[in-house]
Regions:
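Conserved Rossmann-fold dehydrogenase catalytic segment
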Residues: 149-150, 187-192
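Short, glycine-rich nucleotide/cofactor-binding loops
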Residues: 18-28, 96-102, 212-215
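Long, charge-dense, solvent-exposed interaction surfaces that engage phosphate-rich ligands
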Residues: 167-174, 178-189
């Protein structure tokens, strides 16, 4: 197999995933706006959840939200059976991800969320799924096909879900009027944080400065 053929495989995968993201624009409706509004007015935290690849995507979405002004963290729905349910309160909002909207582990978690009167926003590829029906607001993320040549491995679908999570985070940033200095507050170790937050006093050395008395001779 020549290098040109191998490169064409990669190029096609990128085209498929790029198109999958662009296709999501057609599904943008007032549910997206309502989801952003609910997250903006949340008095607690955004609890992002999902299983498998959706869980990995959810963890990244939670990290992006948290670093851009919206308190959030990821929770594995399997862990709630072993004490993690204690981190949740009725002031929170759950953001649940599932391509099918029918993931068993996630659906077993949802009744607990409803019992605690916690509102649910879901991102799925099936607006008629049980998860969508349980949700206060549902955002459809549907792809025509996966970038995987077998149309099996989650590729285009996870990319589209991740991009939709970024869209939520970016919309929230703009609603909050999030500024570079706000960003720096959450990234004190990054280059931007150091540049915006470091003052002259932080780097100035005053206690051990070598001071030469004026009466001292050059030879000394």
């Amino acid at each position: 197999m020549d290098n040109k053929t191998i490169r064409s495989y990669g190029e096609q995968a990128l085209r498929d995933e790029a198109q999958a993201i662009l296709d999501q624009i057609q599904y943008m409706d007032d549910n997206f706006e309502k989801a952003v509004d609910m997250m903006f007015h949340c008095q607690g935290k955004i609890i992002v959840t999902g299983v498998g690849k959706s869980g990995h995507v959810g963890a990244k979405i939670a990290a992006t939200l948290a670093s851009t002004g919206t308190p959030a963290f990821y929770i594995n729905p399997l862990d709630v059976y072993h004490g993690d349910l204690g981190v949740m309160t009725d002031k929170d909002v759950v953001l649940a991800l599932s391509n099918s909207g029918q993931t068993d582990e996630l659906l077993r978690f949802i009744p607990m969320v409803l019992h605690m009167n916690i509102p649910i926003i879901s991102i799925t590829g099936n607006p008629d799924s049980l998860l969508a029906k349980y949700s206060n607001h549902h955002i459809t993320v549907k792809v025509k096909k996966e970038a995987c040549p077998l149309n099996l491995a989650p590729t285009s679908s996870t990319t589209a879900a991740l991009a939709t999570g970024d869209a939520l985070a970016i919309a929230l940033m703009q609603v909050r009027h999030f500024k570079p200095r706000d960003f720096a507050q959450f990234h004190p170790g990054g280059e931007l944080g150091k540049r915006l937050l470091t003052t002259a006093e932080d780097v100035m050395r005053s206690d051990d400065m070598p001071i030469i008395p004026k009466e001292m001779h050059l030879g000394e």
